[in-house]
Swiss-Prot record:
Belongs to the FARP (FMRFamide related peptide) family. This is FMRFamide-like neuropeptide FLP3. The keyword Secreted applies. It is found in: Secreted. The keyword Chloroplast does not apply. Its main location: secreted. The lineage of its organism: Eukaryota, Metazoa, Ecdysozoa, Arthropoda, Crustacea. Transmembrane segments: none annotated. GO terms for cellular component: extracellular region. Keywords: Amidation, Neuropeptide, Secreted. It comes from the Eukaryota. The modification Phenylalanine amide is found at F9. One of its GO terms (biological process) is neuropeptide signaling pathway.
Length: 9
């Protein structure tokens, strides 16, 4: 799973 911070983009 990707970082939550990355998904914010």
């Amino acid at each position: 799973n990707y970082d939550k911070n990355f998904l914010r983009f």
